[in-house]
UniProtKB/Swiss-Prot annotation:
Group of enzyme by EC: isomerase
Homology family: Belongs to the IPP isomerase type 2 family.
Listed name of the protein: Isopentenyl-diphosphate delta-isomerase
Residues holding FMN: S62, A63, I64, T65, S93, N122, K183, T213, G259, I260, R261, A280, L281
Subunit structure: Homooctamer. Dimer of tetramers.
Biological process terms in GO annotation: isoprenoid biosynthetic process
Species this protein is from: Methanothermobacter thermautotrophicus (strain ATCC 29096 / DSM 1053 / JCM 10044 / NBRC 100330 / Delta H) (Methanobacterium thermoautotrophicum)
CDD domains (alphabetical): IDI-2_FMN
Function as written in the Swiss-Prot or TrEMBL entry: Involved in the biosynthesis of isoprenoids. Catalyzes the 1,3-allylic rearrangement of the homoallylic substrate isopentenyl (IPP) to its allylic isomer, dimethylallyl diphosphate (DMAPP).
One GO cellular component term noted in the UniProt record for this chain: cytoplasm
UniProt-annotated binding residues for substrate: R5, K6, S93, Q94, R95, Q151
Catalysed reactions listed for this entry: isopentenyl diphosphate = dimethylallyl diphosphate
The protein's required cofactors: FMN; NADPH; Mg(2+)
C-alpha cells in the first residue's frame, strides 16, 4: 500500500545514510570576496516575489512527506514554521491523499496550520486526473509535478514507462488555475529537458540535483536485491552543474535543491542564477522536535546567506546574481564540456 511505503521512506530518510556519496558541486564554486563591501549588513534584503507570492526568504522547505498518519506531525510542524517565517512549503506526493480520502488530513493539516503561507502541491507526471484535486485539497498556491525515473527504476514494482510525460505535463498546466512547476527528485535536470519543460508551459523548474538525498539509496534499503540500488546510488547531475544548465537554458525561475546544507550553499546557488533554494533533510529531524527547531534551522540558513551576501557586497538577491563567481574542478569541467562558458561568471560586476 502507498501509505506503508510513505512511512518506510520517512523512517529510512530519518534514520539511515541515504545521501549521495559524491558532492553537490558547490565545493567547486567560490564567490569572490570583497574586502570593502560598501554596504550595511543590517540593510541586506533577502525577500523576493516568487510566482506572485511575497516571501521573506529564498529558502523554501522542499517536499518531504504525506500520505501516512505518522507524517501528519511532520507536516504540521513544517507548516507552523513556514507560516511564522513567511516562506514557501512544498508537500510530498499527494497521490495517497487523492486515492485514499482518509489520508487527506496528512496534507490538509499544512493549510490549517499555515493559512497564509505559500503551499506547493505535488503529483506525479502521469497523474493528470489528480491535478485539480491536489490543488483543491490544500488550497495550493502552486503545483509541483515530480519526476523520479531513477527512483522508479530501483523501487520494487516501480513505474518505468515515461512515454508521453511531456504531453501529460502540458495537460496538467492546462488543467489547473495555479502555476505549475516541475521538480526532479535528486538526480537533476539537464539543459535539454529544461527547454522541453519550458515549452510545456511550466512556470518554474526545481533541479533537485545529485548530492543530497539519494532515492536510489532509499530504495536500496527496501529492496531484497540491493545490487542495482548500490550501482546507481550516485547517479545524476550534481546540483551546481544542473543549476547552471537550467538557468542558462530557460527564462523561467529556477529552484536549486539537492544537498543544500548551509546558507553558503544557498548563496552559491543564487549566485549561479537560482531564484530559490530548497532544503528537506536538514529540517526533517528538526520537525520531530517541533516547529521552533525548524525555525532555528531556517534562521541559521538565512543568517549565513546574509553574511555571504555582505562579504560579496550584495545588498539584494539580484545583486548576488551579478557578483563574480569562480567555477572550478569537476563542475567547471562538466559545464565546459557541455558547452557552457564559465569564465563569464568570474568577471561579472
Amino acid at each position: 500500500m502507498i501509505s506503508d511505503r510513505k512511512l518506510e521512506h520517512l523512517i529510512l530518510c530519518a534514520s539511515c545514510d541515504v545521501e549521495y556519496r559524491k558532492k553537490t558541486g558547490f565545493e567547486d564554486i567560490e564567490i569572490v570576496h570583497r574586502a570593502i563591501p560598501e554596504i550595511n549588513k543590517e540593510k541586506i534584503d533577502i525577500s523576493l516575489d516568487f510566482l506572485g507570492r511575497e516571501l521573506s526568504s529564498p529558502v523554501m522547505i522542499s517536499a518531504i512527506t504525506g500520505g501516512h498518519p505518522a507524517s501528519m506531525k511532520i507536516n504540521r510542524e513544517l507548516a507552523r514554521a513556514a507560516e511564522k517565517l513567511g516562506i514557501a512549503l512544498g508537500l510530498g506526493s499527494q497521490r495517497a491523499g487523492v486515492e485514499h480520502p482518509e489520508l487527506e488530513g496528512t496534507y490538509t493539516i499544512a493549510r490549517e496550520e499555515a493559512p497564509s503561507a505559500m503551499l506547493i502541491g505535488n503529483i506525479g507526471s502521469s497523474h493528470i486526473e489528480y491535478a485539480e484535486r491536489a490543488v483543491e485539497m490544500i488550497d495550493a498556491d502552486a503545483l509541483a509535478v515530480h519526476l523520479n525515473p531513477l527512483q522508479e527504476s530501483i523501487q520494487p514494482g516501480g513505474d518505468v514507462d515515461s512515454s508521453g510525460a511531456l504531453e501529460s505535463i502540458s495537460a496538467i498546466v492546462e488543467s489547473v488555475d495555479v502555476p505549475v512547476m516541475v521538480k526532479e527528485t535528486g538526480a537533476g535536470i539537464c539543459s535539454e529537458d529544461a527547454i522541453e519543460l519550458e515549452s510545456c508551459g511550466v512556470s518554474a523548474i526545481d533541479v533537485a540535483g545529485a548530492g543530497g538525498t539519494s532515492w536510489a539509496a532509499v530504495e536500496t534499503y527496501r529492496a531484497d536485491d540491493r545490487y542495482l540500488g548500490e550501482l546507481f546510488w550516485d547517479w545524476g547531475i550534481p546540483t551546481a552543474a544542473s543549476t547552471v544548465e537550467v538557468v542558462e537554458s530557460v527564462s523561467i525561475p529556477v529552484i536549486a535543491s539537492g544537498g543544500i546544507r548551509s546558507g553558503i550553499d544557498a548563496a552559491k546557488a543564487i549566485s549561479l542564477g537560482a531564484e530559490m533554494v530548497g532544503i528537506a533533510l536538514p529540517v526533517l529531524e528538526a520537525a520531530g522536535h517541533g516547529y521552533r527547531e525548524v525555525i532555528k534551522v531556517i534562521e541559521g540558513f538565512n543568517e549565513a546567506l546574509r553574511t555571504a551576501m555582505y562579504l560579496a557586497g550584495a545588498e539584494t538577491l539580484d545583486d548576488l546574481k551579478k557578483s563574480p563567481v569562480i567555477i572550478t574542478g569537476h563542475t567547471g569541467e562538466w559545464l565546459n564540456q557541455r558547452g557552457f562558458e564559465t569564465k563569464k561568471y568570474a568577471r561579472r560586476s
